[in-house]
Amino acid sequence: MGKYVSTYFSPNRGAADTLIGFISKCSVSIDAAVYSLTHDGIRDALIDAHRRGVAVRVLMDRLQSKSSYSDDEALEEAGITVLRDKKAGSMHNKFIIGDSKAVGSGSFNWSKNADKRNAENFLIVRLAYVVREFQVEFDNLWELNS
């Protein structure tokens, strides 16, 4: 694992486990903008973080959230604030900001298929200026969809 940037891949090469570990290490805040969320382990890690007192906000693609496999309702039932983008089909981001210290991003959809079948990538970046840029983008998206 690099000091400032770490790379992970799928299928079955650590991307999902790394994302779950990233979430489990957060102690203050998690902001996530995702296209799809159907991976049970990622869902459970977000719920566990919320139960530990971590402030969790999730912005999802509206059309994907309507899938019967989507975990958005499970997050809401656990008390996590979930917004769906107002322009259905336009949210294709896949990033997470942890404790305002690191960003996880890449092509990796938060799904079982991405973990087990698809060729995907996931980066963790620990550079303050990159984290700030992602936070500004998340805050803008959150405000636009509130």
Region locations from a protein language model:
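A general structural motif
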Residues: F9-A15, H39
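Short, structured motif recognition centered on aromatic/hydrophobic residues
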Residues: Y35, F95, F134
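Short gly/pro/ser/thr-enriched loop/turn and capping motifs at secondary-structure boundaries
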Residues: L63-S67, G89-S90, S111-K112
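Short, surface-exposed coil-to-beta transition loops
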Residues: S90-H92, R117-N118
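Signature of lipid phosphatidyltransferase scaffolds
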Residues: A102-S146
